[in-house]
Amino acid sequence: MNARRKLVLVDGSGYLYRAFHALPPLQNSRGEPTGAVLGVVNMLNKLCREESPELIAVVFDAPGRTFRDELFEQYKATRTPMPDDLRSQLQPLLDCVEALGLPLLRITGVEADDVIGTLAKQAAAKDMDVLISTGDKDIAQMVSERITLVNTMTDSRLDRQGVKNKFDVWPEQIMDYLALIGDSIDNIPGIDKVGPKTAAKWLNEYGTLDQLVKNAAAVSGKVGDNLRAGLQTLELSRKLATIDSNLTLECDLESLVRREPNKQRLRELYTRLEFRQLLRAIEGGAAAAGAPMTPPPAVESAAAAARPPTNYTTVLTMEDLQRWLERLQSAELIALHVEAVSLDYMEAEIVGLAFSIEPGTAAYVPLLHDYAGAPQQLPAATVLQALQPLLENEQLAKIGHHLKYGEHALKRKGIELRGMRFDSMLESYVWNSTATRHEIDAVVRRYLGFDPLHYEDLTGRGAKQIPFSQVAIDTATSYAAENADVVLQLHRVLWENISGVPAMRMLYEEIEQPLVPVLYRMEQAGVLIDGELLRQQSLELARHMREIEARAHEAAGGPFSLDSPKQLQDVLYGKLGLPVLGKTATGQPSTAEAVLEELAEKYELPRMILDYRGFAKLKSTYTDKLPLQINRTSQRVHTCYHQAVAATGRLSSMEPNLQNIPIRTPEGRRIRQAFVAPPGWCIVAADYSQIELRIMAHLSGDAGLLSAFAEERDIHQATAAEVFSLPLEQVSDDQRRTAKMINFGLIYGMSAFGLASRLGIERSEAKRYVELYFERYPGVRRYMDETRQQARERGYVETVFGRRLYLNDIASRNAALRQGAERQAINAPMQGTAADIIKRAMIEVDRWLSTSSIPARLLLQVHDELVFEVQQDAAAELMARARELMSAAAELRTSLKVDVGSGANWDEAH
């Protein structure tokens, strides 16, 4: 019996977008982006190697309007334009596809989905097997006994039953399903507030959209009202979502035969794109699409776990709980998701817990769901008591996504979570800190290729949002169990990539993951705030603001609101006729801070406005707000430290942000006076001195800088002496100030123009200073030039500890964006290395505090500074040990200097 012929249809446009968004940005030495092309070529090679198709077509959307645009003028109107760095990769990719011998289709007037649907239907009618490679849910409507979908992102396949398992509707119901839920990306209206669950429920009950419409009057509740309100657009939504599989195409199936690759053309393309591995494969006889080759360490090429049909269980009986406890006890890795009612971890009340130990299988244990008709749940105390030995078992490895939050929630119930080996949020962050936001929804979309359930889909938004405890338990199970399930899948994909890069693995295992319990303890400790002192400062700031307001009214010749940009424009530029130095996006004269700073050099009123704004910000952000954030139980303020926000590796402090309290003004420093120690205790602050300049000396290896630090000279005075060719003792204060600005300006990639602006000198003079600096410190210039070149070639720079800092705009055609990325390339290794060093110091200090009997706590991390609370009689020991441990946190070619002080409050200790 002859084997059935196979046709493979590839959603080329989908491949391109997914490769662009899922892979680290790459570019060749000319600065041309190439990462998406490489990703698609590798995916095509893999697909052809595994499927060996006789017939194949790679289908792309053609430019121009389609019949859907004629049906609905707003179709896809909300889509963001294709990024320039993606657009520039389209033609090179088309060239590569053709050179690989793969038939390429771009048909004007129709979408790629319609071409794929038509060819699939024709082939199935001729008894061929059809495999459609796509991540697009719309094409699920084409699945039949002969037509299957494959998602190369997850290696998962969807036959008819697979579609039913994934969407809870059959393929022939998909267009009705899509019409109901709509599509925000394609701007398909759908029915307001109708999500996948409701759409599937209706279609399972009524069979078709037409039958649902006939029975619309019988659908009760708010969702029924929404259905009836949207009936007029439903047919339009269905037409927009339905694939036209009856096109008349000029090509026939036999024209889709896979051809021999054009090796010479591939050599030319791969040489220009600098795909060295693919070039080697050609020379080794593996030029054809599908020939074996080692893929780069990218997510698409990882052995990502297939996403099987899900089996999510709600645990409502002790028997079910006991069965899951037995499974968890023998699991290699437990994925844990804690669902709680408050984003404030000090107030978080656990509503339920979800577990997963294998992809596709998970359980949710509801504890506190409280709504009319809610099923009986196991007593929370009973469940937590049963789980406590497992959760506190250090030997049972656990993983979560931002699991520190769950750790806090469990702490409130007397459970100390142990055995946390992995966190998929941190894995995503270590793999590529700039690729995406690191919330679970975004990470799943990027690395698993599907859109998970969203929290707000369950709870609603804004004023009408309900607490999770009022979400129906079956719906909550789908959400919470999926959260636990995808964490395991993300770990499989991300850890394979991270563990393949030794420096990244070290960064994760020795810095990021060990830091989690340190931050947890700092957050639990909180910091003592003198609320009454802050309230007094608020009154004083308000008085200063009133005084400034009175003087401003006098200077302007009449009253106006200093808080109103429009009134400021009228007074500054209309009434007083000050020069317009900048404009807003709408063309209005700007009152931004930078503009006012420049005007304040010559005019009195702009300086008053800046002072007023400074006082207003201190008042609203700190002196008014901090007393309200004192926890009613601990009587302390508890910030939240985020590891996966700043691209450079810096920690972020939020709710409240305690890292941006000003220190350069007397009023800002006074706020730090409200950070106090309890009676008998004191505050100790330990601060790295000029750490980024020391890192610059290490990275550049410049003999002059290294010598200055080795001899413990005043680095700014030493720089001034070098630049101005003076003995150290003859350097003036102004010359030292200039040298300081040059030192720090160069770290942040400041140009001669920026330096001139900061110093208030001519650009030519600033340029001369920079040239003199580089003459005296040639190693710094060499390091900067080499770093910029490496950034262009690789698309990223690295810290001393191997943290990769991707520069998405390093190859941009936009000069401003490109130059900004080049400045980041210089600064990021220094800022990132400083972040890595203080994290290492925190881990070592915490290890010492945890194993010693010293009465002290680490409270805050603020940039290059650690703040402690210690009993007064132990302060000297802490200060000596903190200096020692922080100084030893990294071995650089320069020593790390740590300044340590103590006092009754933070200001005194600094």
Q: Where are the regions a protein language model picked out?
A:
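Conserved "right-hand" nucleotidyltransferase catalytic core of DNA-directed polymerases
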Residues: 230-373, 435, 443-444, 455, ...
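Active-site-proximal helix-loop-helix substrate-binding element of RNase H-like nuclease domains
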Residues: 106, 157-185, 304-312, 344, ...
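Non-catalytic nucleic-acid-binding/docking modules located in mid-to-C-terminal regions
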Residues: 2-4, 52-57, 125, 144-148, ...
